[in-house]
From Swiss-Prot:
Protein name according to UniProt: Cortexin-1
Localization (cell): Membrane
Renumbered residue ranges of the record's region Disordered: 1-20
Similarity comment text for this entry: Belongs to the cortexin family.
The protein's role, per its UniProt record: May mediate extracellular or intracellular signaling of cortical neurons during forebrain development.
Residues that span the membrane, as ranges: 30-50
Organism: Mus musculus (Mouse)
Length: 82
């Protein structure tokens, strides 16, 4: 009995799987879409942060800091000092 490998003369049947360079499978497309969504969220957050840094007081309503100051001046928050 010989231990040498011999090639069969008949051709191999074509594979039923996708070709090697055909594209992305389902898991890769899902990961790609998820990463793309994360990048979009990151860009939106960066734009928002830059806009806040450039003009921080335009995003703050005037009533949130003027009313609070008036309340402190009226002495309504004396219990907070205890």
């Amino acid at each position: 009995m010989s231990s040498a490998w011999t090639l069969s003369p008949e051709p191999l049947p074509p594979s039923t799987g996708p070709p090697v360079g055909a594209g992305l499978d389902v898991e890769q497309r899902t990961v790609f879409a998820f990463v793309l969504c994360l990048l979009v969220v990151l860009v939106l957050l960066m734009v928002r942060c830059v806009r806040i840094l450039l003009d921080p007081y335009s995003r703050m309503p005037a009533s949130s800091w003027t009313d609070h100051k008036e309340a402190l001046e009226r002495g309504q928050f004396d219990y907070a000092l205890v």
